[in-house]
Amino acid sequence: MRTWRIHELGDPIDQLTLDEVAEPELEPGRVLVEVDAVGLAFPDVLQCRGEYQVKPPLPYCPGSETAGRVSAVGDGVDQALVGQRVVALGGGLAERVVLPEGSVFT
């Protein structure tokens, strides 16, 4: 799966790399989203520079605003979400992303 990732802090234009990574693993309470679109905003830039209050461990995939379709859900998540178009928070600069159910909205 292709994903854009930050391996070192700095300006996104200099630090973003397109990586081939393993498919994300679905866990209980989580949702797999096939990403259709992602929004990058100023908080993403600050996070890439290490200047935002949330500091994910490196490497990480930015993209705080994600839109797509749910392709699978983990144990404990309503199966009715599968196939639904959603917006979600976090890690969206990838082909697919696994997120906590509470970060996905219909």
What is the meaning of each model-derived region?
Residues 5-8, 35:
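Pocket-edge structural micro-motifs
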Residues 1-2:
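Extreme N-terminal starter segment of soluble prokaryotic enzymes
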Residues 22-40, 51-92:
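Glycine-rich beta-strand-centered segment in the early N-terminal region that forms part
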Residues 6, 48, 71-72, 98-99:
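Short beta-strand-to-turn element immediately C-terminal to the catalytic PLP-Schiff-base lysine
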Residues 8, 23, 99-101:
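Active-site donor-binding loop signature of nucleotide-sugar glycosyltransferases
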Residues 10-18, 42-44:
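Short N-terminal binding/cap micro-motifs at the start of the first secondary-structure element
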